[in-house]
């Protein structure tokens, strides 16, 4: 079951959520929409009593959007002992010390408490939430992760009305003049995003606040934070950050945000040989519409050419001579396969030969090779929109990548996979213990070489793939990506 929790007052934004949940259905999966105005989310003097309650209209919109059923529990079903006496979950302080959490104490504790209760009752497989309230989405993602709940969280892009104002149940409170102010609110944030993307310079929060006040808005906060940690970003300005703000138009509180970036997102996937990086990275790139940069293939291409010309992989001077005339080309993925060419010759299968595999570590250890390949890879990734896999992508090639993953598996598992790959390619398959010993030795060489050793970046997330299918690994990578990069920043291809 796919689940869309709401507080009612459904609008175009909710319709988009329900439609997304319905479009992801397969087989006998159903889409459930809940309507429950949660008292724990409202503070003193907030609008709990007058919050829109339009159940009949909600049912109609939900059905038209693809919902299988609508669930409208009463308070006693959600909080059997009453909301005042119910068990409560506390969201981490670091996730609610800024943005809306800084001015609405207890609000997100109420959100995580009710959603945890709804999930326990409904038991869905996937939970669909809007990216409009990014802080809420992030906190709920952390709740699911930290509590080990068996549900996958999916974010859906912010929906805007024709005039640019983000869809909200509270928009109906606005008169014509206030609505125009709300439109200007959205425009100021959009202008800040454009200035960063095209000019490379982000407006300071103080400047954004000044512009909002100039159009008559009462500003509650303007802040720039890391999209996952919801604290000021420590990365350089190439990385993605979240510009978020809350204002009041009359008595109506509005929130909105924009993602600031100077390029499209980058993903760096590192890990030891045989961890399945190439297989899953190719499929991940296709699913997300990212360009696939197979850096391992580039090093294999150099190694192949060295061997083809009779050179010694351990002789740096001989290898350097090969680099003078080297031209490596990686063609776009076609049905999961990336064609590799060296100086015009197609070598896609040749670079996977065991001779190349045995020598690639020695060739890649030369400083001249690393420098040449790193420079070429960085040129290819300058505009972003790319995923690369290798040994030092997150530490040397793209240290400012939005997502860094260290994908690994035990030597025994990697030996098993290597045997299957060799068999599929028609090569002779050594005994598994021999393959495992080769992998352990390769790890040692890669981790101890002087130039660009195999290392896990400090901010990389380790993903151990033993016992996981390829699809499960790709799902895990997609979820990690979406923690930081929303659908409204990089939409999943249809």
From Swiss-Prot:
The active site is at residue 14. Its EC number is 6.3.2.1, 2.7.4.25. InterPro entries: Cytidylate_kin, Cytidylate_kinase_dom, P-loop_NTPase, Pantoate_ligase, Pantoate_ligase/cytidylate_kin, Pantoate_ligase_C, Rossmann-like_a/b/a_fold. Beta-alanine binds at residue 41. (R)-pantoate binds at residues 41, 136. It catalyses: (R)-pantoate + beta-alanine + ATP = (R)-pantothenate + AMP + diphosphate + H(+); CMP + ATP = CDP + ADP; dCMP + ATP = dCDP + ADP. In the N-terminal section; belongs to the pantothenate synthetase family. In the C-terminal section; belongs to the cytidylate kinase family. Type 1 subfamily. This is Bifunctional pantoate ligase/cytidylate kinase. The lineage of its organism: Bacteria, Bacillati, Cyanobacteriota, Cyanophyceae, Synechococcales.
